[in-house]
């Protein structure tokens, strides 16, 4: 019953947010054979998303644009600096670029196909405050293996081994700050299929001193011990934290100071 109410809530929100809201249920329930659709946000961008096998774009769109999972706990200024790790096709980066239009968004996505659509979405909407990078983020500045999930283009991972893999350039969070001369990050968003642990646990305190808010998905953590280690480290670095379960399969950690 709760799942039905959740879907009805998303449909109602799609009517509020989308000019072509009628496309949302068609894609959500996989009733179209078109490989792509464009969602036209009211007073906002057009967003290209995939609809076929292997695409969870519609669910990512619902989480980010309709349910506002990454920004719901925070108030940020218009000139905020955002780092988006695991930017997929750019849905959060574009939302952040519009809400904080005097700021800057550093967007990192390792998969070439996802990155192409991210770039299309940026160029089509003539957005100039997103800096996209076709990089993975990990504890390495070298090439690493990205394991591909043929059933979900949003679930490629450097940890969950599959038969299909590609070599991708990686960068550490520390080097993101140094290479881009970032002196302050108002929000660090992470959705990188389990790489959150090695990214955060290998980032020095001097970098955390420049970060003021963090939001990350927690559903990838089958080992609760690792998530607790992250939380304890954030507490050591003067962050307050809260875990929230948004739905049965959507959990998030919010941190701020």
Q: Where are the language model's segments positioned?
A:
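Phosphate/nucleotide-binding beta-alpha loop and adjacent structural elements of enzyme active sites
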Residues: 1-257
């Amino acid at each position: 019953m709760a799942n039905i109410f959740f879907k009805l809530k998303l449909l109602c929100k799609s009517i509020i947010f989308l000019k072509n809201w009628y496309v949302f249920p068609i894609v959500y329930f996989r009733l179209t054979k078109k490989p792509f659709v464009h969602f036209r946000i009211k007073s906002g961008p057009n967003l290209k998303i995939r609809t076929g096998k292997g695409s969870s774009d519609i669910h990512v769109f619902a989480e980010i644009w309709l349910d506002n999972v990454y920004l719901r706990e925070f108030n940020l200024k218009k000139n905020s600096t955002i780092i988006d790790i695991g930017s997929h096709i750019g849905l959060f980066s574009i939302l952040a670029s519009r809400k904080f239009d005097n700021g800057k968004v550093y967007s990192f996505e390792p998969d070439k196909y996802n990155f192409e659509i991210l770039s299309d979405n940026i160029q089509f909407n003539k957005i100039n405050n997103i800096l996209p990078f076709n990089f993975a983020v990990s504890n390495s500045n070298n090439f690493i293996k990205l394991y591909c999930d043929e059933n979900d283009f949003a679930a490629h991972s450097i940890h969950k081994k599959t038969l299909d893999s590609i070599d991708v350039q990686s960068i550490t969070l520390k080097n993101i700050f140094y290479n881009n001369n970032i002196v302050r990050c108002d929000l660090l968003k992470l959705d990188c299929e389990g790489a959150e642990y090695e990214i955060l646990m290998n980032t020095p305190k001097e970098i955390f001193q420049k970060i003021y808010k963090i939001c990350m998905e927690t559903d990838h953590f089958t080992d609760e011990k690792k998530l607790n280690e992250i939380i304890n480290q954030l507490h050591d670095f003067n962050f307050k934290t809260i875990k929230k379960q948004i739905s049965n399969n959507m959990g998030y950690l919010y941190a701020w100071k």
